[in-house]
Every structure is written in C-alpha cells, then in structure tokens.
Amino acid sequence: MGKTLYQKLFEAHVVHEAPNETPLLYIDRHLVHEVTSPQAFDGLRAMGRKVRQPGKTFATMDHNVSTQTKDINASGEMARIQMQELIKNCAEFGVQLYDLNHPYQGIVHVIGPEQGMTLPGMTIVCGDSHTATHGAFGSLAFGIGTSEVEHVLATQTLKQGRAKTMKIEVTGDAPHGITAKDIVLAIIGKTGSAGGTGHVVEFCGKAIRALSMEGRMTLCNMAIEMGAKAGLVAPDETTFNYLKGRQFAPKDANWDAAVAYWNTLKSDDDAQFDTVVTLDAAQIAPQVTWGTNPGQVIAVNQEIPNPDSFSDPVERASAAKALAYMDLQPGIKLTDVKIDKVFIGSCTNSRIEDLRAAAEIAKGRKVAAGVQAIVVPGSGPVKTMAELEGLDKVFIEAGFEWRLPGCSMCLAMNNDRLNPGERCASTSNRNFEGRQGRAGRTHLVSPAMAAAAAVTGRFADVRELN
C-alpha cells in the first residue's frame, strides 16, 4: 500500500523506535521566540548543557514587541524581561537572533519561509501553535511546549507519536475574489473546530494548487484551528520558484539535488487516508466568523444561525454562549453589524500578497468615521517591499495606521488590543473570548474583507466593492 506525504516525512526522520515506545524524531529546524523560550534556556543552563545544533536554531522577537517603536521597553516590564532574556540566551548559546533592530526581524512564521529556513521535507518545530504554517512547503511542522523546546535545544530530537491522516481536497476553481483565508474558513466551517483532532491534514485539489505560497501558508497556518496537529501541501513548481535564491535555500548543484528529492514528496496514488473531506471551491463565498471559535463561520451574505438549528447539544450551547458574548442576534446579517477596529496582520495574513489585496480595496477610499484600522507587516522585508510598491502611502492616505512588524493585535500581549466591547474585523487566526483583549469581539476575515470593513464601517461583501 502506498504512503501519504505525512507518513513519508515522519518515517524519514525516525532516529530510534523501540517496541511499544514513542518514536524519536530528528528535528531539522528549530524556531524560537521570546515567550516560550526563557525557561527552556534556563533548563539548559541549570544542567550545564549546550544547544546541540545552534546552526539549525533561529530566534526572533515577535509576540510582545511594540509596532509603534523599536524601544524594548514600550510593551511593559514583562515584555522587556522576555526580550532581554532572549538577547542574553542567544548570545550565550550561539543562536542566530533577529532582534528588534535587525532588518529581517518579524513574525517567526513569516521570516522562516522568506529567508529560506523553511524547506520541503524538513521537520520544523517552534514553541508556538501556528508552526503548522511551514507545512505549506511540504515540511512536517508543528508547535511544541516549553519543556519540549528545551529537549530540542539539547538534543535536536523530539518524541512524537504517529498521527492519523486526513485529506482535504478542494476541487474546481475558486471564484474571483475568494482567497486562501476564505477557503480555510469554509473548510473549518465544514469540519468544525475539532474535526481534525489527532490528524495531520494534507490539503490538495485544483483550488489548492492554484494558490500562491502566501495562500498556502494561510491555509496551513489555520490547520491547527480545526484541531489538527499539522497541515501539509505537497511541494511543486510554485514552491521551488518561491524558494530559489533565498538566503538559506540550497545553491547551484545542491539546489538541483534538492529539487529532485523534493519532487518525491507527495502522497502515493494508492495511499489510504483515515479521513477524507471534499469541498467545491466554486461554492465558497467570502467568509466571516460570527462566534468564538473559527468553526462558527458563515458566508458574508448569510444570516447568523439560530442556536436551536444545531442538533448537537454541545454545539447548540456553544452557539448560544458565543452569540451572547459577541452581542449578536440570530437571523441578522453581518453586513448590518458595525465595527470599531480593523487589524490587518498576523502570521496568517501579513505577507506582501495580503497587503496588496487590502491596499487594492483601500485605494481611493477612506477609513469610516469612528473606526481605527491598523496594518502590521509580518517582517522587515515585507515592510520594505510594501513601501517600495507604495502600499504604505495607499494605506496612510486612506486613514489606516502603518506599523512596524510584530504579532500585534492577534493576541493581547502587547499594546495593540481591543477595549472591552469593541468589535474587530481581523485577519488573524483565533476569535476566542478575550484573544485580542478582555471582552473584545473578534471576527476573522481575509485581508480584502478587513479593508472593506474598514472603509464601510461594517462587514461588507468585498465582491461588491471590487
């Protein structure tokens, strides 16, 4: 019987597997940030250990950095301590750090791919749940906890059990204006926020192949939001064209050899998946979440569902609780709902393609009265490229705030956050209660939909603005 891409990647990295024991995997890349690493480095220090492979370990500051200044003190005392600890730890243990003043600094899941640290066939870990992003390149990438961060720093290995496999095929062509964010939200709407639990998901089908690498990263980034361990897209010419010439990508003859190997990284035709889900891309409309998990999502032109319409009692109770928290009524359309803030950024949607899509809607328009809209590029290189293209001027002229790179309003760990009761159209990945600030209300959308909300003051069907 044939093997899935996940099975091939897993088996290629097994270092040791004894009967009735969890396999030990080799880790090719370890990405580190300021929040989940301090205790891990302290553990090394306490035991007198070194980082086993500093050349395969890369660090940046992203979660609690200010997006308005490069002052390490700007986000408060705890943030300052975490960033100073990262500086100290990377210097002591010989780890490459992209600090606040480095031109490549940015969100860890943006800088890895754009520097070519992320390559097909790798195992990649980070103390961050959205490490699944890197699976867009055909790499097995997943988030780990702080104790596991220490284990990888010390040994370059990690114990991992085998996951079940899920194939999600999106057939046909996506309509004009439908983005990877709409596709993945539609998928999660179908599977539910726990539909992928215990699985590694492989995304495939004509609509997936048509996506850029930025789009595929958005897709895999949110695999975790359906409960999956990781998300994968098999590498192809789109992948290779994106990677060629990047700093850490192979060069010359090594490049040719790498591509030859990367072309083998796909599921066999006769591979068996534990679960298969199929969607028709032609049926996907712009998506907006209405509740407090990413699976509580509808098309922008649909009505908010009545909790009584859910047959499952847990879903019914969850929907009722979500509507109360979000201060929404069943039966209304989100196009009638006003917003207070707009956030365009995060490891889901802060790449150059995302900013271009938002700028296309913002151009020649103005942010609605009473709305604060911020645009946060995912890295220094993204910011530089956007400014070379004049996107910053488009946003600023429209009334958006143009910020410095960082995780920003995706999570309330810095100065960018919602006040209680504020409603936000956000391009991030989680709409949990309090995620963007205590009692804040988050609606997940694509960058174009976020820009449309900014200029209309409410959720709007971006297809009507184009």
UniProtKB/Swiss-Prot annotation:
A Pfam family the protein falls into: Aconitase
Cofactor(s) this protein cannot do without: [4Fe-4S] cluster
Coiled-coil residue windows: none
PROSITE patterns registered for this protein in UniProt: ACONITASE_1 (PS00450), ACONITASE_2 (PS01244)
A biological-process GO annotation: L-leucine biosynthetic process
Keywords: 4Fe-4S, Amino-acid biosynthesis, Branched-chain amino acid biosynthesis, Iron, Iron-sulfur, Leucine biosynthesis, Lyase, Metal-binding
UniProt entry tagged with the keyword Nucleotidyltransferase: no
Biological pathway: Amino-acid biosynthesis; L-leucine biosynthesis; L-leucine from 3-methyl-2-oxobutanoate: step 2/4
InterPro entries assigned to the protein according to its UniProt record, in alphabetical order: 3-IsopropMal_deHydase_lsu (IPR004430), Acnase/IPM_dHydase_lsu_aba_1/3 (IPR015931), Acoase/IPM_deHydtase_lsu_aba (IPR001030), Aconitase_4Fe-4S_BS (IPR018136), Aconitase_4Fe-4S_dom (IPR036008), IPM_dehydratase_rel_enz (IPR050067), IPMI_cat (IPR033941)
Residue positions binding [4Fe-4S] cluster: 347, 407, 410
Catalytic activity: (2R,3S)-3-isopropylmalate = (2S)-2-isopropylmalate
Cofactor remark from the record: Binds 1 [4Fe-4S] cluster per subunit.
GO molecular function, one term: 4 iron, 4 sulfur cluster binding
Keyword Metal-binding tagged: yes
Entry EC number(s): 4.2.1.33
Superkingdom of origin organism: Bacteria
Family from the record: Belongs to the aconitase/IPM isomerase family. LeuC type 1 subfamily.
Known function: Catalyzes the isomerization between 2-isopropylmalate and 3-isopropylmalate, via the formation of 2-isopropylmaleate.
NCBIfam families associated with the record: leuC, PRK05478.1, PRK12466.1
Binding partners and assembly: Heterodimer of LeuC and LeuD.
HAMAP family in the record: LeuC_type1 (MF_01026)
Protein name: 3-isopropylmalate dehydratase large subunit
Record organism: Pectobacterium carotovorum subsp. carotovorum (strain PC1)
Taxonomic placement: Bacteria, Pseudomonadati, Pseudomonadota, Gammaproteobacteria, Enterobacterales
